[in-house]
UniProtKB/Swiss-Prot annotation:
The gene is ayg1. The active site is at S257 (nucleophile), D352, H380. Changing S257A: Results in a complete loss of enzyme activity. The lineage of its organism: Eukaryota, Fungi, Dikarya, Ascomycota, Pezizomycotina. Keywords: Endosome, Hydrolase. Disruption phenotype: Leads to a yellow-green color of conidia. Impairs the accumulation of 1,3,6,8-tetrahydroxynaphthalene (1,3,6,8-THN). Results in an altered conidial surface with masked surface rodlet layer, leaky cell wall allowing the deposition of proteins on the cell surface and exposing the otherwise-masked cell wall polysaccharides at the surface. Decreases the protection against the host's immune defenses. Causes enhanced insect mortality compared to the parent strain in a wax moth Galleria mellonella infection model, probably through exacerbated immune response of the wax moth. The keyword Ion transport does not apply. Belongs to the AB hydrolase superfamily. Pfam families: FrsA-like. This is Heptaketide hydrolyase ayg1. Its main location: other. Changing D352A: Results in a complete loss of enzyme activity. Changing H380A: Results in a complete loss of enzyme activity. InterPro entries: AB_hydrolase_fold, FrsA-like, FrsA_esterase. The keyword Hydrolase applies.
Length: 406
């Protein structure tokens, strides 16, 4: 009997590994044509020529400068078209073009913006992505606003400021404060990659707040300190308390992929502040098992992932990460999940080869009772089946009585 629920797939090397041609033709082209992960807001007419170029030049390493550079002219051309549309008063067209430019930048800096390389070309692409995206969303009826939150609870190697996005529905004000969904982003998806989620959240009359997780993008929390996210959320929640149009007594968090780890942690450490938490495709313990880490680069994630994970957790080498991360960061090993928690919904595909489904199942053996929905035959995140369940659960939880603030 195999040790891992993933079964034979645990030892399988997926055919797209090391081949951008196979990745594009077998996985990404279809996702791009549907504008789904990781191509949200994108258009295949922008991407097909780029991937044809990369394939013709045999560029297969997404970590290379050549990979990123291949996307930049297309993104710049879209920004120029957007400027012309804006000058002509065509605001909706300009916004759509800028969103398309932003997602081209997003794929160019995929899969990870190395926080230890502030001058890298991927960082440049990320900065351009944010600029294009905020221009695009400023043209929406209900725009997304960037706010720089003071990290009032910071210690040690934490940075001083926390950039977040906030989007509120029409009618939100001091006399009508609205519930909050705080999105915790992932390893490769950052603040500017969540348009559709904010649309869905606002359509239900809630505010969307989007924040990045330690070791990624612009997050100032010390990636090497397992307790840094606790201070991060303390500062974010303290700021949100000061916004009169936001009802912080009716708040849930939604952690996506790597963000799911932080949703699980917050469900325990900040249980008195939250009505609930969704951990969507989360790791908590087994994803850091050396046996799992020895095989994860072979699985469904588009590129190698362990180097990014190592940097994200504050390690200088993959070897140090593999040797020490589970003992240091596991929410089981450190006893976090033995504490009481707020309501916690766990969602994933049973065939997840990025973080094992065991990381959801083990939580039912610890702490407060949990809720879960797992999808046989589906990979990481359990898409598309898991999304309707997410919104149904949020609707139920945010209709519950408010939390009493301390």
């Amino acid at each position: 009997m195999p040790r891992w629920i993933l079964g034979d797939k645990f030892d399988t090397v997926f055919p797209h590994k090391g081949s951008l041609k196979v990745l594009w033709e077998s996985r990404w082209k279809s996702a791009c044509s549907k504008s789904v992960y990781p191509f949200h807001d994108g258009s295949i007419e922008d991407f097909e020529p780029i991937f044809n170029h990369l394939i013709s030049k045999n560029i297969n390493d997404a970590a290379s400068d050549e990979y990123t550079q291949a996307f930049l002219p297309t993104a710049s051309a879209l920004e120029e078209k957007a400027a012309q549309a804006l000058q002509a008063g065509k605001h909706e067209e300009a916004s759509n073009l800028l969103c398309r430019a932003a997602v081209v930048y997003r794929i160019s800096r995929f899969p990870y913006v190395d926080i230890t390389k502030p001058s890298s070309i991927k960082r440049v692409a990320f900065e351009r992505q944010k600029q294009a995206y905020l221009k695009a969303t400023s043209l929406w009826t209900q725009p997304i606003r960037e706010v720089t939150v003071p990290h009032t609870y910071r210690t040690g190697n934490d940075g001083a400021h926390i950039p977040i996005y906030i989007r509120t529905p029409a009618g939100a004000d001091q006399s009508n404060p609205v519930p909050i969904v705080l999105i915790m982003t992932g390893l490769d998806g950052y603040r500017s990659d969540n348009s559709q989620r904010t649309h869905e959240i606002l359509a239900r009359g809630w505010a969307a707040v989007v924040a990045e997780i330690p070791g990624t993008a612009d997050c100032p929390a010390d990636p090497a300190d397992p307790a840094s996210p606790d201070r991060l959320w303390d500062s974010v929640l303290s700021y949100l308390d000061q916004r009169p149009e936001l009802n912080t007594a009716k708040m849930v968090v939604w952690g996506l992929s790597a963000g799911g780890y932080y949703a699980i942690r917050a469900a325990h450490t900040h249980r008195d502040r939250l009505l609930g938490a969704i951990a969507h495709g989360p790791g908590c313990h087994y994803y850091l098992d050396p046996e799992w880490l020895a095989k994860v680069n072979d699985h469904e994630y588009p590129f190698e992932i362990t180097a990014a994970w190592a940097t994200k957790h504050g390690y200088k080498t993959v070897e140090e990460f593999v040797a020490g991360a589970q003992k240091k960061f596991s929410l089981v090993e450190t006893g976090i999940v033995d504490q009481p928690s707020c309501r916690l919904l766990l969602l994933n595909g049973v065939d997840d080869g990025v973080v094992p489904i065991e990381d959801c199942l083990v939580l039912f053996e610890h702490g407060s009772p949990k809720e879960g929905r797992f999808y046989k035959g589906l990979p990481h995140m359990g898409y598309p089946n898991s999304l309707p369940v997410s919104y149904e659960w949020l609707e139920q939880v945010l209709a519950s009585p408010s939390k009493t603030k301390n």
